Amino acid sequence: MAGRNKAKPRLSKKEKEERRKDMAEVQEKVFSVVVPVVVAFTVVIMLIVYLKTRPRTDF
C-alpha cells in the first residue's frame, strides 16, 4: 500500500455516479463543438484547393 495517494479521498458511490455523468456531458459538448469545427475547416480547405486548381478558360 505504499503507492497509494493518501491525500486523495475515496469517492462515494453517489460521487462516482455524478462524476461519470459530468464526464459524459463534457464529452457530448466536445463532440458538439469539435465535429462542426473540423467539418468547417475541411470544407474551407477543399474550397481553397478547388479554387486554386480549377481549369481557367480564357475569353
Curated annotation (Swiss-Prot):
Residues 10-30 form a coiled coil. Its main location: membrane. Residues 1-11 have a biased composition (Basic residues). It holds the Pfam family DUF4519. One of its GO terms (cellular component) is membrane. The chain crosses the membrane at residues 30-50. InterPro entries: DUF4519 (IPR027960). It is found in: Membrane. Keywords: Coiled coil, Membrane, Transmembrane, Transmembrane helix. Residues 1-20 are annotated as: Disordered. The keyword Coiled coil applies. It is a single-pass membrane protein. Belongs to the SMCO4 family. This is Single-pass membrane and coiled-coil domain-containing protein 4 homolog. The lineage of its organism: Eukaryota, Metazoa, Ecdysozoa, Arthropoda, Chelicerata.
